[in-house]
Amino acid sequence: SGAALRKYNEKLAILDFSEWIAPTLVTTNPDLILIFLGQYQDIIVKPLDGMGGREIFRLHKADPNLGSILETVMHYGTRTIMAQKYIPDIKKGDKRILIIDGQVVPYTMARIAKKGETRANLAAGGTANIMPLTEKEYDLATELAPTLLTNGVFLAGLDMIGPYLTEINVTSPMGFQEISKGSDC
């Protein structure tokens, strides 16, 4: 529904399902990002309003460009960003799971990053592989589906890296064509 599209920030919606997410921080304060980075050593930062892999950065404690990257992604402290512990399973793909009217599509599109790239988004040069959902992916999707439906979300694309939910896409849950062509759905 239109109200659900306005209510759901695709990045923040995962916070309602904290048992399924990697350690996460949402802030406008670069000092808190540095503390979070000190705790986890390897993190991803991204704007709340981004899409297609734009302005997503992987940060390491010793990165000499750390200050510049944070200034850029945080627009000099005027933009709220999300930081998440880096999930090494990204090498196996960032998986898109579709939920349509509360029903879980039993296949996923795994977006694999191109060599030398952290972002697996197709817009960033990633490739797509279609495969059946794992039991864990199916369990996550079936747990979230009723809550999404109750909140007026009839179409959603859940993004997972390894065992972690990373995003709930409601405005452009891509993957229909790829999953339809690559499966028996």
Residue spans of the language-model regions?
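Short, charged, surface-exposed secondary-structure boundary motifs
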Residues: 8-11, 56, 117, 168
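Phosphate-binding site of ATP-dependent enzymes
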Residues: 30-31, 38-42, 48-140
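A structural signal for short, well-ordered beta-strand segments and their strand-loop junctions
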Residues: 1, 26, 44-46, 82, ...
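Short, hinge-like loop/turn segments at secondary-structure boundaries
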Residues: 14-19, 43, 62-63
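ATP-dependent carboxylate activation and anion-phosphoryl transfer catalytic cores
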Residues: 115-116, 129-185
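Short glycine-enriched loops at secondary-structure junctions
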Residues: 2-6, 111-113, 161-164
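Conserved N-proximal alpha/beta basic substrate-recognition cap immediately N-terminal to
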Residues: 1-32
